[in-house]
Each structure stands twice: as structure tokens, then as C-alpha cells.
Regions:
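N-terminal transmembrane alpha-helices
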Residues: 10-47, 61-76, 80, 105-112, ...
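Small-residue-rich hydrophobic transmembrane alpha-helices
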Residues: 53-113, 150-169, 263, 276-334, ...
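Small-residue hotspots at the loop-to-helix junctions and early N-terminal turns
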Residues: 48-61, 140, 199, 271-286, ...
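Short alpha-helical transmembrane segments in multi-pass integral membrane proteins
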Residues: 1-23, 81-146, 179, 190-246, ...
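Transmembrane helical elements of multi-pass membrane transporters/channels
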Residues: 21-40, 142, 176, 205-209, ...
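Helix-terminus/linker motif at the lipid-water interface of multi-pass membrane proteins
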Residues: 31, 35-54, 123-130, 186-193, ...
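Residue-level signal for transmembrane alpha-helical positions in Major Facilitator Superfamily
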Residues: 20, 24, 36, 73, ...
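Short runs within selected transmembrane alpha-helices of multi-pass transporters and secretion channels
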Residues: 74, 142-161, 169-180, 198-213, ...
Length: 450
């Protein structure tokens, strides 16, 4: 397949099919990355023990907390590249590619060192039960050894997404997913390595993905080509990336921190609740990545059209992305919740673990489509270069509410199901605020143009 055939003209022509063609591979790519973690959870749950399942699953909020800042910066890179492309600024594209590439390497090494260093303290702070603590620490440290490669792939994929190429990163992840699955089974079943086996398998799969994305960028033509001999960090592009990416990343970090607080409360219900919640969360991630795909489409398409001054198309792009997110996410939410025992049985045969997992799916997963309201609205605002306002509203409406719920409300209503009610409540509150902010922004844009 030629490089041109993988790219999308975002500035001209009908939008619906272009957005769909862009979003489907992006959703599949995100789902495959989540599959790495799901395979880890399923293999240890089925072939090791429920405690090993709890050890791997309890790390998800910690991993999200530590990587979200850098994932946010990659989002900023996508916006900056999209704006330059919309303005037909090849030199700006070239400088941004160079900056993004170096930032991904530096960020990856920094995050690896931080992750390895804080693994035990942060898991102890979360009240991780003593019977799973050592396994959880081991998994987390080994996971972070591979994190530089994870970030190199994600920053590289952001470069390709800015021109509409979501298919080639998907092809890489398909192969990486097969590598991860095979290594998981070999290391856990044949060599009896348990949690360390699944962490090593994930790290090797991330190495493969990073190597492939670098090769693709080296083979690009024109301004998008990665040139090692001309690599440097350009201050203007870095500042713009950070202006957009850091608020988005901090939002993700605070968001994850609130989930760490909720996870700490879940830990108080014992290892069966931890394992059940860990299994159920996998399906939340699968559904969430439908929203992520629509977010990515909104950022790239709106970024280019905003850069080109095509505000009517910006409004249409937002509506299409919101519709796709709501319909797709709700359909997946309903399917997984309807057959919750069947899907949970992929991760464990323990009936008590399945019971807790089903409670989470019925109380949280079924209502997850509501998150589209603030996720896609926030992505639309970021595509227009406005990152701070959706961050502030999301931090307040989602993160602060969850912390207040755990520390103030939940102690008066003892129960696993009652604890989880905070998720749909926070989605409704945050969605209302960010939707209003988007419509205010569009009104101002149209007024200026008039």
C-alpha cells in the first residue's frame, strides 16, 4: 500500500465516511493496545491465580496516572501538526516532527525511571493488600522498563494520524498483539513466570511496535520524514505542544488520580473485589476506546479545518464525531453488560470474583456512553487550540467529585455498588459543563467571522 493511499484529505469533500475510515483503525489500534493488558490479566487469572490477577489488575490506575501527562503531550503534537498542515506550512511540519521525535525519547526514559522508583510507595499508599503487594510491585517495575518504547510508538502514531494515516499503526499493533499473546502463554504456562512473564511479554511487544513506527517515519516523503541527522527540539513548536498537551495530560493525570482513590476504596473490599473490578475494567477500556477514536478524529479533522479557517466544517465534524461516539459506545456498553457473566469468565472462573465484576459492569459500564459528552467536546476545543478550559471543567466535574464521594459520601453508604455510583454522576456533571463551553466557543468564532 502506498503512503498516499493511507492519508485522508480532511479539508475538502464529504466528512462522514472520511471520519469513519479514520476512526475505525484508530479504535482498533487503541483496542489492541488495551488487549496487551487484557491478555496479561486473562493469562494470569486463568493460568496463575486470583491473587496474580489482582496484582496485575490493580496496577491499571497507577500506569494511567504516570503515562497520561506524556500521552497528553502527544495529543498536543497532533494538534500542532494538524494546524500546520491546514495552513500548508511544510517547514512547521518538519520542525514539529523533529521536536516530537526527540521529546518521545526523553519522555520515555524519564517516565521509566520515575515508574520504577515509585512503584512500591504508590502501591502501598493505595492500601494494596499484603498478599498481592510484592507481585504488583514486580509487575509494575518490569512494565515500566518497556515504557520508552510505548511512548515512541504513540508519538510516532500521532505524527501519522495528523495526515489521516491510522491504518499502518493498526497493522503494526496487530502483529505486536500476536507477539504479546504468544509470549504470555509461553512464559506463564511453559516457564511458570507468572506476573513477571506477562510484563516481559508486554515490554517486548512495545519494543517491536516502536521499531516499526520508526521505520515507517524514516520512509516517509517530504516534511513528515524522520531525519536523524537533523533532529533537534524547536522552542516554538515545543511551547505550542506543551500549551495544548500539558493541560490535557494533567487532566488525564488528575483523572487517573481520582481513579487511584476509587481503587484504594475498592481495595478495602478484599482481593475478590479487586480482581472482579480489574476484570470488569477491561470492558470499560474497550468501550472507552470507541470514544478515544472519535476524540482522535475530532482533534485531527478540527485541527486542520480550524487552521484553514473552515469553521462550518468544524461544527459538522463535531456533530458527526459525537453521534459516532454515542451510538458506538452505547452499543458496546449494552452488549458487554447483557452478557456480563460470559465475558467475565474469560478472565476468571472464581464465582465471587465474577459477582463483583458483574456489579461493576451493571453500575458503571452500562452508562459509560455518557462520557462522550465531555470527551468529544473537550477534544473539539483542543483541536481549536483551547486546552485549559476543558481541563479545568473535567478536573472539577469528574476528579474532585470522585474524591469527595470516596472520602465524604461513601463512608455513610457502605457497599461496593454504592461506591461505584460516582462514575455516572461525574460523567453527567462534567458533560453539561464542557458541552456549554464548546457551544460558547463556536458562537464566538462565528461572530468574529461575521
Amino acid at each position: 500500500m502506498s503512503q498516499t493511499s493511507t492519508k485522508v484529505d480532511m479539508l475538502n469533500g464529504p466528512l462522514f465516511m472520511k471520519i469513519l475510515i479514520f476512526a475505525l483503525p484508530l479504535a482498533a489500534s487503541s483496542l489492541l493496545q488495551q488487549l496487551f493488558n487484557s491478555v496479561d490479566v486473562a493469562v494470569v487469572g486463568r493460568f496463575a491465580s486470583s491473587k496474580a490477577l489482582a496484582a496485575v489488575g490493580s496496577n491499571a490506575p497507577v500506569i494511567s496516572l504516570l503515562i497520561n501527562l506524556f500521552v497528553g503531550i502527544s495529543m498536543g503534537a497532533n494538534v500542532v501538526l494538524s494546524n500546520h498542515l491546514g495552513q500548508r506550512d511544510d517547514e512547521g511540519v518538519r520542525r514539529t516532527v523533529s521536536t516530537v521525535s526527540l521529546v518521545s525519547v526523553v519522555s520515555g526514559v524519564l517516565l521509566m525511571l520515575i515508574g520504577i522508583g515509585v512503584s512500591r510507595p504508590i502501591l502501598e499508599l493505595m492500601d494494596t493488600p499484603a498478599d498481592v503487594l510484592d507481585m504488583a510491585v514486580l509487575y509494575l517495575r518490569l512494565y515500566f522498563v518497556g515504557i520508552p518504547f510505548f511512548l515512541i510508538f504513540n508519538f510516532g502514531a500521532a505524527i501519522l494520524r495528523s495526515v489521516g494515516d491510522t491504518r499502518r499503526p493498526l497493522y503494526i499493533l496487530v502483529v505486536a498483539g500476536v507477539i504479546n499473546t504468544v509470549l504470555n502463554l509461553v512464559l506463564v504456562i511453559c516457564f511458570g513466570l507468572g506476573v513477571e512473564g506477562v510484563a516481559i511479554a508486554t515490554a517486548i511487544a512495545n519494543m517491536f511496535s516502536a521499531a516499526c513506527i520508526v521505520v515507517l517515519l524514516r520512509r516517509e516523503k517530504g516534511a513528515l520524514q524522520l531525519q536523524f541527522n537533523h533532529m533537534r527540539i524547536y522552542g516554538k513548536e515545543l511551547r505550542r505542544m506543551l500549551q495544548i498537551g500539558v493541560p490535557a495530560g494533567l487532566q488525564g493525570m488528575v483523572f487517573s488520580l481520582s481513579n487511584v482513590v476509587v481503587q484504594s476504596a475498592i481495595n478495602g473490599y478484599g482481593s475478590a473485589a479487586i480482581a472482579g473490578s480489574a476484570a470488569a475494567v477491561n470492558f470499560e477500556y474497550y468501550c472507552y476506546y470507541i470514544i478515544v477514536a472519535c476524540n482522535g478524529a475530532a482533534i485531527s479533522f478540527i485541527g486542520q479545518n480550524y487552521g484553514a479557517g473552515k469553521y462550518d466544517r468544524v461544527r459538522r465534524i463535531f456533530r458527526i464525531c459525537m453521534l459516532m461516539g454515542l451510538v458506538g459506545c452505547f452499543a458496546a456498553n449494552a452488549l458487554f453488560t447483557w452478557q456480563n457473566h460470559f465475558f467475565l469468565s474469560f478472565f476468571t472462573a472464581d464465582p465471587e470474583v465474577i459477582r463483583y465484576g458483574a456489579i461493576r459492569m451493571q453500575g458503571v459500564l452500562l452508562f459509560q456512553f455518557m462520557a462522550c459528552s465531555y470527551e468529544i467536546s473537550g477534544s473539539a476545543l483542543r483541536g481549536m487550540g483551547e486546552s485549559m478550559s476543558p481541563t479545568i471543567m473535567t478536573v472539577f466535574g469528574t476528579c474532585v467529585l470522585r474524591m469527595v464521594w470516596v472520602f465524604v459520601v461513601s463512608p455513610h453508604y457502605h457497599g461496593f455498588a454504592q461506591l461505584l455510583q460516582v462514575y455516572p454522576l461525574s460523567w453527567v456533571l462534567t458533560g453539561a459543563m464542557v458541552l456549554v463551553a464548546y457551544h460558547v466557543r463556536m458562537k464566538k468564532l462565528c461572530a468574529v467571522r461575521a
